[in-house]
Amino acid sequence: MDFYYLPGSAPCRSVLMTAKALGIELNKKLLNLQAGEHLKPEFLKINPQHTIPTLVDGDFALWESRAIMVYLVEKYGKNDSLFPKCPKKRAVINQRLYFDMGTLYKSFADYYYPQIFAKAPADPELYKKMEAAFDFLNTFLEGHQYVAGDSLTVADLALLASVSTFEVAGFDFSKYANVAKWYANAKTVAPGFDENWEGCLEFKKFFN
């Protein structure tokens, strides 16, 4: 399977951790966005939305990290522990995945990306949205070791990729006790966290 990615990208790193958890070897293809490689005709033919991560499994192409994670588990998982078949458990996992995409990671992108890529000043109102997102996550984790149930799922891997990116950006989430406790545990139990952290440090260069 070909996997088009950037190591600094949190969505890409969440897929890499999922593949590691499943014991899948991906043929990693580095895509240089700054050089416009994602806009070349050969890549647009694979993914007309020209985004990363993008997975190519035979004649099937898929993008959007959370969709890729679920696809890999459903097709290649030896069991359903990362994405249980129980409708209620699966619904909670999906909610957490959508929360990551639409609230938590979005708050990161909205606050930090203009500063990184457009040299814009920090917006205190957008900072408050990041704090609100962490408040929600902290509430979700009340009384729970994992973000969606009693064991590690794709929701943990997606949120771990995001939260570790907040860490290298310098966002202090220590005051969110449940998040801090979950993060400390998730780092030790998530397969492939070392590679995830290497990608985080790559991304951190944007802040130097």
UniProtKB/Swiss-Prot annotation:
Domain GST C-terminal per the UniProt entry, residue ranges: 86-207
Ranges in a coiled coil: none
Similarity field: Belongs to the GST superfamily. Theta family.
Binding-site positions, glutathione: S9, H50, T51, I52, E64, S65, R66
Name assigned to this protein: Glutathione S-transferase 1-1
EC number: 2.5.1.18
Organism encoding this protein: Lucilia cuprina
Described function: Conjugation of reduced glutathione to a wide number of exogenous and endogenous hydrophobic electrophiles.
PANTHER family per the UniProt record, alphabetical: GLUTATHIONE S TRANSFERASE D10, ISOFORM A-RELATED
Catalytically driven reaction(s): RX + glutathione = an S-substituted glutathione + a halide anion + H(+)
Keywords recorded for this protein, A-Z: Transferase
Domain GST N-terminal: start-end pairs: 1-80
